[in-house]
From Swiss-Prot:
GO terms for biological process: tRNA N2-guanine methylation. Its EC number is 2.1.1.216. CDD domains: AdoMet_MTases (cd02440). Pfam families: TRM. PANTHER family: N 2 ,N 2 -DIMETHYLGUANOSINE TRNA METHYLTRANSFERASE, TRNA (GUANINE(26)-N(2))-DIMETHYLTRANSFERASE. HAMAP family: tRNA_dimethyltr_TRM1. Keywords: Metal-binding, Methyltransferase, RNA-binding, S-adenosyl-L-methionine, Transferase, tRNA processing, tRNA-binding, Zinc. It catalyses: guanosine(26) in tRNA + 2 S-adenosyl-L-methionine = N(2)-dimethylguanosine(26) in tRNA + 2 S-adenosyl-L-homocysteine + 2 H(+). Zn(2+) binds at C237, C240, C257, C260. One of its GO terms (molecular function) is tRNA binding. This is tRNA (guanine(26)-N(2))-dimethyltransferase. The gene is trm1. The keyword S-adenosyl-L-methionine applies.
Length: 379
C-alpha cells in the first residue's frame, strides 16, 4: 500500500494514503487514517499529559496514531490494539521507529478488555461505542475515554436506531447536540453502575460529526450511587420550546407545559451532571499556552467555551426563539449581557453558533428579545 509520512503534535508517523475522492470516512486505504480527528487526538493528548494515567489502551487503533502520540507526547506506557493484521503491521513499524514503552496487540477489542485491565482505556470506534462499553467499564481502572460518531441516532434524527442502541428516547430538539452527548454519557454511566462503579466527567464536548467524553472511573459503591443520582430526563413540550430537567429519576414524570397546556415528552435517560472538571480544564489551558498542536487555535477556543458554560443540561437557540416570536434575532452579545444583568448566568455555547447556555427561564429570554426589538428596530 502507498504510505506517506505525517506529523501531528510532536509525533511523526507513517500512514496509508487516502483517496480523497472516495467516501470519507471510512476512506479507501486498507487501514484508515482520519485527518478530520486531529483535534480530537490533540485534546486527548493534552488531557493525558495533565492527568498522567499509569498506562493507556488504544483499543481500536487503525494506524495507531492516537496511541503513538500518547506514548511519545505524554510519556506513559501504551498498548495499541487492532484486530486487523495490516493495521498491526503499520502500528509495529511506527512503534519500532518511534521507540518508547509501546506494546502492540492484534486482538478483538472486547476479548482484550475481558482478559486485561488498563489504567485508561480509549474507545474510538467507527460508529457507536455501545458494543465495547460493557467490557471497557470493567477493564478501565481509573479513566475511560469514549467517542461516538453515530450522531444521527443520538440526536434523534434516526429515532429507532437511537432507541435500540442506547436504550433511551432521543428527540431531535433545537438542543439536539447536547442531547446526543448526554445520551452517550448516560449510557456510559449506566454501564459503569452495573458493576458498582461510578464516573466523574473531566472533559466532554460535541464537535462536527462526533461526541467525545473523558471520565474518571470511580470504584466505590457510593460513587456508583452518586452517579446514578446524576441520571435523569429533560421533559420537553412537543409544541413549544419549554423544557424542564428531572435529575435522579430512572423513569420520567410527566408534567403539563405551563405555556401550552399539553403533556411534556421525555428525552433520555441522559447524564444530567456536570460535563467538565473545570480545574483540569484550567490546567489544560495553562499548559496549552506553552505547547504546539496543529489545532491549537481550535483547542484554545473550545477550552474557553467549556470553562465558561454554566452547568445547565440544555441550551437555547435564540434564532429559533426569535423566529417563533416572529421578530428579528437580537445581537447575541447584547442578549447575553441583558440576561446576566438580570441575574441569570449566561454564555455562548460550543454546541451551537446561535446557542446560549443560561440559567434564565424561557419567558425571560423571550422578554429580553422583545425588548431588544422594541429598542433597536423602531421605525
Amino acid at each position: 500500500m502507498e504510505c506517506r509520512e505525517i506529523t501531528e503534535g510532536s509525533t511523526t508517523f507513517t500512514a496509508p494514503v487516502q483517496d480523497e475522492t472516495t467516501q470519507f470516512p471510512p476512506g479507501s486505504a486498507p487501514v484508515f487514517y482520519n485527518t478530520k480527528m486531529e483535534f480530537n487526538r490533540d485534546m486527548t493528548v493534552l488531557l493525558t499529559k495533565i492527568v498522567q494515567p499509569e498506562d493507556y489502551l488504544d483499543a481500536m487503533a487503525a494506524t495507531g496514531v492516537r496511541g503513538l502520540r500518547i506514548a511519545n507526547e505524554a510519556k506513559i506506557p501504551v498498548t495499541i490494539n487492532d484486530r486487523d493484521e495490516q493495521a498491526v503491521k503499520i502500528i509495529k513499524y511506527n512503534a519500532e521507529k518511534l521507540g518508547g514503552d509501546i506494546s502492540v496487540t492484534c486482538d478483538d477489542a472486547n476479548r482484550l478488555m475481558c482478559t486485561s485491565r488498563f489504567d485508561s482505556i480509549d474507545l474510538d470506534p467507527f460508529g457507536t461505542p455501545v458494543p465495547f462499553l460493557d467490557a471497557a467499564s470493567r477493564a478501565a481502572k481509573h479513566y475511560l475515554f469514549v467517542t461516538a460518531t453515530d450522531t444521527a441516532p443520538l440526536c434523534g434524527a434516526h429515532f429507532k436506531a437511537g432507541c435500540r442502541r442506547y436504550f433511551a428516547t432521543p428527540r431531535n430538539t433545537e438542543y439536539h447536540a447536547e442531547v446526543g452527548l448526554r445520551m452517550m454519557m448516560g449510557t456510559m454511566a449506566r454501564e459503569l453502575v452495573k458493576y458498582d462503579r461510578g464516573m466523574k466527567p473531566i472533559l466532554s464536548y460535541a464537535k462536527s460529526h462526533y461526541f467525545r467524553s473523558h471520565v474518571r472511573v470511580l470504584g466505590k459503591v457510593t460513587a456508583a450511587d452518586e452517579t446514578l443520582a446524576q441520571i435523569g430526563f429533560v421533559m420537553q413540550c412537543p409544541k413549544c420550546l419549554y423544557r424542564e430537567e428531572q435529575k435522579g429519576s430512572l423513569y420520567p414524570k410527566m408534567h403539563i407545559c405551563p405555556h401550552c397546556g399539553v403533556e411534556t415528552v421525555p428525552v433520555g435517560p441522559l447524564w444530567m451532571g456536570p460535563l467538565q472538571e473545570k480545574e483540569i480544564l484550567a490546567e489544560m489551558q495553562t499548559a496549552l499556552a506553552e505547547l504546539q498542536f496543529g489545532t491549537k487555535r481550535q483547542m484554545e477556543k473550545m477550552l474557553t467555551f467549556l470553562l465558561a458554560e454554566p452547568e445547565t443540561c440544555t441550551y437555547y437557540d435564540y434564532h429559533i426563539i426569535s423566529r417563533n416570536m416572529k421578530v428579528s434575532p437580537p445581537n447575541m452579545e447584547e442578549l447575553i449581557a441583558s440576561l446576566n444583568e438580570a441575574g441569570y448566568y449566561t454564555t455562548r455555547t460550543h454546541f451551537c453558533d446561535t446557542g446560549i447556555k443560561t440559567t434564565a427561564p424561557l419567558p425571560l429570554i423571550e422578554e429580553k428579545i422583545r425588548l431588544w426589538n422594541a429598542k433597536n428596530l423602531q421605525m
